[in-house]
Amino acid sequence: MARDPIHPGRFLADELEALDMSVPEVAEVLHVPANRIYQLLKGQRALTADTALRLSQWLGTSAEMWLNLQKLYELRVAERQLGERIRKTIVRRETSRAA
């Protein structure tokens, strides 16, 4: 059985725990509303390019890493919700090879 997709907020929560920082403290450091961080941590908000840039600057990571976590999460959610139906309704295109 496949594991549940992991929202990037989960990774952020791990960082905050390791740094022993509260949401309001992180929001202040990142210059964003605390509600944005709360929603990310709860998996109720997608991680945007803006937030990825801020996190990467603060944590010394790359914005691409954070955005890749978001896209992987979205892809796994879509696969769970739509994958089987798509596989049943869309026929793979046949490729022809030149002789």
Descriptions of predicted regions:
Residues 44-57:
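Short, basic-rich loop-to-helix N-cap that marks the start of a DNA-contacting helix
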Residues 17, 28, 57:
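Short polybasic/polar patches that bind polyanions
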Residues 33, 44, 59, 70-73:
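The DNA-recognition helices of helix-turn-helix-type DNA-binding domains
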Residues 21-39:
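Short alpha-helical DNA-recognition segment
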Residues 65-99:
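Short, charged recognition helix plus adjacent turn
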Residues 8, 62-63:
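Hydrophobic side chains within well-formed alpha-helices
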Residues 1-21:
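A short, Lys/Arg-rich alpha-helix, primarily the initiator
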